[in-house]
Structure formats: C-alpha cells, structure tokens
C-alpha cells in the first residue's frame, strides 16, 4: 500500500510532455483557447513568486465540463515556462478511488522532496483536480497553506463546495467562478 502511494506521488511530478498534452485537443492537436480570467490568474502566480503577494491559493469553481481543469493546466504551463518546473498534479478523484486522501499524498510528498513541507524553501506549485472528492479537502489545504509558505496552490472543484468552504480556508483561498463559454 505505502509503495503504491509513493509511486503515485512520484508520478505526480509535471513534465513538459504532459503539459503540452493537457492544453491541446487530443484529436485536432489545436491548443485550447485561453479565457480572459487566465490573465488575472497568471498575475496571481507572478505576484506571489515575485513579491510574495496574496492570494497564493486559488480555487476554480464551476459546473462540470466548463474548462476548470484545462484552465488549471494552462496556468501550470505558464508557471513551468516562466517561474518553476517544480509542479505537482493530483487528481483527487483518482486518489480517493484508490483509497488515499490528499493528506496522505502530501505526507508522501515529504519523502519525495526529502524534507517536511513546513521547512521546504523552494518555489512549488500544487495542482489539485476535483478537490471536493476528499471529504477533508478544506482542512488539508488550510494546513498545506499554513505550513508550506513557498507553495502556490490551484484547486478545481464543484461550485457549491468551493464557495461554501470552511471559514478558516475562506480567508486563505481566492475562489474564481468559471462559467461556460458563450458562443
């Protein structure tokens, strides 16, 4: 069991090929369009890593299929090309399906990184897709925010759950609502 989770965490490291695959249509090979909100989210990333500005935890909330995950990957590609290659992606639905929580994955992250997250001093980006699938997601992300001060966190999830988060996390996470494209 422990080796399985360690393997999952090791595979969570984002590599260039994965980034390119996630921002393009798999059949047509065309890069997905960027939303206007990308510019604001890009600014959050730049400002945190350049000046230490808040927010450093962003929730992308919206209906299923509106493009939250694609937007997250577009931000990851920007961060990879301009800020840090130290980016980690966790599909929380898959983690939970295998019987693991976000907290368990983060504990294994410490093994992979070679130190506790509360003393980690390099720029790092965490991507959590479908974060609401973990019942303890809000508490876990609050702890991650408080302990890993060099981390920028992007989480996608259900509108209702992200918007109605715990009061502790509400002060830490900036929730951006993602709406369907209009044609």
Map each language-model feature to its residues.
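Phosphate-binding site recognition
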Residues: 1-183
